[in-house]
């Protein structure tokens, strides 16, 4: 049944055993019962089942306008009664007793370690398979056929490649107490609420009771933003002041404009793109807020009203690509029969244009890349070097949780990860040669993508482990291959998923390892659950995506879908546009000497200088401790999810993050310690369960409630996407 020791490890709470991060000290228990069975029959059944269900549901909702992401927390809660039921009804008989292969279907009470591994399976299903974007782009946007086998191989190799990078860097990103991975504390707290025998204080309630109340309330409430009153998703009241004014619409729209005053009374809107605001450290939330305000309320409007890059010819906020006259760009017309750029048609059609905000976000992506490198070097470089040297030293001071894990369990050998890594790279090389006509990526592109991934994984890992924000570095992969190997959109997409998404997947695995670290799960058992969960998830995600593309008419095609359709695929749209800019047309014709946006490259320099200025300020003014909390990669990368995320997602998220991260944490510390993460889990679960119920009971049958609160334009700002330049004609917009 896995690695079982024979001792219970209590830990005295002296100064040496205190965690360096207060939130971890308040949340994570310092005890371990290493005799608990882990790899049980019910763990495999419930874990694989949860993985299948979440994979299907999340891929199903991936294509929706507000893509609901059902986290592993939902399954974490749902399996508890099932686990206890199996513990009561399964036979306790031992099979093959007396041999090394003996096992039982029921080793006793359902325990927290089984529960954690089931959740790891669920997390595999909850995390998206990013390579499905390639399927969507080719089949739905480029309107090309795609064989299933190479598509599936790309999907599975993308996910598995991250294991290799995770194995190489887990010692530096899991064992140190400073690498605390804030979002894991939600699940740790929830495990405590579901398994601890907690005594209710007089006049209060246990965490389990509190969780159930939140779950029921969230479940009941979500019928309003999810079905009866969808306007609650984005209330843009500023537009009501003058609904016929384009300026007012641009300022107030939460979905198509700057979102001033816009707010969503919908947990899905709040947590859709940035995750739970209750799990974000205050300093990270402040950095996100500053970055959002700078971009949305200073840089974007200034650039727009100064008409930089003919900004007024296009919407102020859009991820679409445009022609010089403001009309949509016909991408399919510039592709030749070999799926390459048709240069003759492109020169006749004209260059690609984009909205001001879209151009600014690309510039911020450039700045985030250089800022990440410089920030980690100046603020964390010495620590990383010390950890690297100390990895081979004995008797060094370790975090209390690391000491418990090393005492009770065997580590996962590095060679396990290396074997997976090398075999996976070999398979990718085979794909690039044998299916080159489909993937367009040469063998040397595979090696270059791996080099980028292995270089940036530790840098982004440090940021994610300490701030709960992972700056997106997809632009570097797109930029590099776009210059070296232009005019091939599929090659660009494949290079991005191998170079960038494998790194993201690695950080997911490392985060799960940290969860196992906190919950004292045998590392080898954790490894097995991660590998199995990933394989199951890839199969289900691929099958679901393939089915939906065949099942839903005009999926993702906003020109043919009804105006109130929920199948608009905002994330796939951004991915497709990126493949056009970086892959089909190439960065040289957009951001290089042949393009109109070459000045955006100055953001690279700005991003590199900014962390140096902050670092110098910390040295010049050491008494001002707030300066060290200015985190440039998080600040400039705050809007990395925009688009497809919109202003209302950020404004709503920030309000909740400040309420709980500052006021409640500061003035109601006892309440925060006991209930904060449990509240987050309850809101997630309630919204998710009601969403599933609404779809199964009403959505599949097309039953709708028609009234002004459910109109197609949910944020009531119909003119927010209108251009303001003279003579530009767009359907539904006034002409100046």
Swiss-Prot record:
A GO biological-process term: protein transport
Transmembrane segments: 43-63, 66-86, 116-136, 148-168, 210-230, 258-278, 288-308, 357-377, 412-432, 443-463, 489-511, 527-547, 602-622, 645-665, 678-698
Tissue expression as described in the entry: Expressed in flowers and roots, and at a low level in leaves and stems. Detected in the cambial zone of the vascular bundles and in the region of lateral root initiation. Low expression in the vascular network of the petals and high in the stamen filaments and the gynoecium.
One of the record's GO molecular function terms: oligopeptide transmembrane transporter activity
Signal peptide: none
Cellular-component GO terms for this entry: membrane
Subcellular localization: Membrane
Membrane topology per record: Multi-pass membrane protein
Keywords: Membrane, Peptide transport, Protein transport, Transmembrane, Transmembrane helix, Transport
Cysteine disulfide partners in this protein: none
Induction data: Induced by primisulfuron and abscisic acid, and weakly by 2,4-dichlorophenoxyacetic acid (2,4-D). Not induced by salicylic acid, hydrogen peroxide, reduced and oxidized glutathione or cadmium.
One Pfam family cited in the UniProt record for this chain: OPT
Function comment: Involved in the translocation of tetra- and pentapeptides across the cellular membrane in an energy-dependent manner. Also involved in transport of glutathione derivatives and metal complexes, and may be involved in stress resistance.
Family, as annotated: Belongs to the oligopeptide OPT transporter (TC 2.A.67.1) family.
Protein's recorded name: Oligopeptide transporter 6
């Amino acid at each position: 049944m896995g690695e079982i020791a024979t001792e219970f490890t209590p830990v005295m709470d002296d100064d040496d055993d205190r965690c360096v991060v207060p939130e971890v000290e308040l949340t994570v228990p310092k005890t371990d019962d290493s005799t608990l069975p882990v790899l049980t029959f019910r763990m495999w059944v419930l874990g694989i089942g949860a993985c299948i269900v979440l994979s299907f549901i999340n891929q199903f909702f991936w294509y929706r306008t507000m893509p609901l992401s059902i986290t592993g927390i939902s399954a974490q809660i749902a399996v508890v009664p099932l686990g206890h039921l199996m513990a009561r009804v399964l036979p306790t008989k031992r099979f093959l007793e007396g041999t090394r292969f003996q096992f039982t279907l029921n080793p006793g009470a359902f325990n927290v370690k089984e529960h954690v591994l089931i959740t790891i399976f669920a997390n595999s299903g909850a995390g998206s398979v990013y390579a499905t974007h390639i399927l969507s782009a080719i089949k739905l946007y480029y309107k090309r056929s795609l064989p299933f086998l190479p598509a599936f191989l790309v999907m599975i190799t993308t996910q598995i490649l991250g294991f290799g990078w995770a194995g190489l860097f887990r010692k530096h990103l899991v064992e140190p107490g400073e690498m605390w991975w804030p979002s894991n504390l939600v699940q740790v707290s929830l495990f405590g609420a579901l398994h601890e025998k907690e005594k209710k204080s007089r006049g209060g309630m246990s965490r389990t009771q509190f969780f159930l109340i939140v779950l029921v309330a969230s479940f009941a409430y979500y019928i309003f933003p999810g079905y009866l009153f969808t306007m609650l998703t984005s209330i843009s009241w500023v537009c009501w002041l003058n609904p016929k004014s384009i300026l007012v619409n641009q300022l107030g729209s939460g979905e198509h404009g700057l979102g001033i005053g816009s707010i969503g009374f919908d947990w899905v809107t709040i947590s859709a793109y940035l995750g739970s605001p209750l799990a974000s450290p205050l300093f990270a939330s402040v950095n996100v807020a500053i970055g959002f305000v700078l971009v949305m309320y200073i840089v974007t409007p200034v650039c727009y009203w100064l008409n930089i890059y003919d900004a007024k010819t296009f919407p102020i906020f859009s991820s679409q690509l445009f022609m010089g006259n403001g009309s949509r760009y016909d991408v399919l017309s510039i592709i030749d029969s070999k799926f390459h750029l048709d240069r003759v048609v492109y020169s006749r059609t004209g260059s690609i244009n984009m909205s001001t905000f879209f151009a600014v976000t690309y510039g911020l992506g450039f700045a985030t890349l250089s800022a990440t490198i410089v920030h980690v070097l100046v603020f964390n470089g010495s620590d990383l070097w010390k950890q690297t040297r100390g990895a081979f030293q004995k008797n060094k001071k370790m975090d209390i949780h690391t000491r418990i894990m090393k005492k009770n369990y065997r580590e996962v050998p590095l060679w396990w990860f290396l074997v997976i890594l090398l075999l996976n790279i070999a398979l990718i090389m085979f794909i690039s040669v044998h299916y080159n006509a489909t993937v367009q990526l040469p063998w040397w592109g595979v090696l270059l993508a791996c080099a980028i991934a292995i270089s940036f994984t530790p840098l982004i890992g440090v940021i994610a482990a300490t701030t709960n924000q992972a700056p997106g570095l997809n632009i570097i992969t797109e930029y590099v291959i776009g210059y070296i190997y232009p005019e091939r959109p599929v090659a660009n997409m494949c290079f991005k998923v191998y170079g960038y998404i494998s790194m993201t997947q690695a950080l997911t695995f490392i985060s799960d390892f940290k969860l196992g670290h906190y919950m004292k799960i045998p590392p080898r058992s954790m490894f097995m659950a991660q590998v199995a969960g990933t394989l199951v998830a890839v199969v289900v995600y691929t099958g679901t995506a393939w089915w939906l593309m065949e099942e839903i008419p005009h999926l993702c095609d906003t020109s043919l879908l009804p105006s109130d359709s929920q199948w608009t695929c905002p994330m796939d749209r951004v991915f497709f546009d990126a493949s056009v800019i970086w892959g089909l047309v190439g960065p040289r014709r957009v951001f290089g000497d042949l393009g109109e946006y070459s000045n955006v490259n100055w953001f690279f320099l700005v991003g590199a200088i900014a962390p140096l200025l902050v670092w110098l300020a910390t040295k010049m003014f050491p008494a001002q401790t707030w300066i060290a909390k200015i985190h440039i990669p998080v600040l400039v990368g705050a809007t990395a999810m925009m688009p497809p995320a919109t202003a209302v997602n950020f404004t709503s998220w920030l309000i909740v993050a400040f309420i709980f991260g500052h006021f409640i944490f500061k003035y109601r510390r006892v309440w925060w310690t006991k209930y904060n993460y449990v509240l987050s889990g309850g809101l997630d679960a309630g919204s998710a369960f009601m969403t599933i119920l609404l779809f199964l009971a009403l959505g599949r049958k097309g039953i709708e409630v028609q009234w002004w609160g459910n109109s197609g334009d949910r944020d009531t700002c119909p003119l927010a996407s209108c251009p303001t330049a003279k003579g530009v004609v767009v359907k539904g917009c006034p002409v100046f």
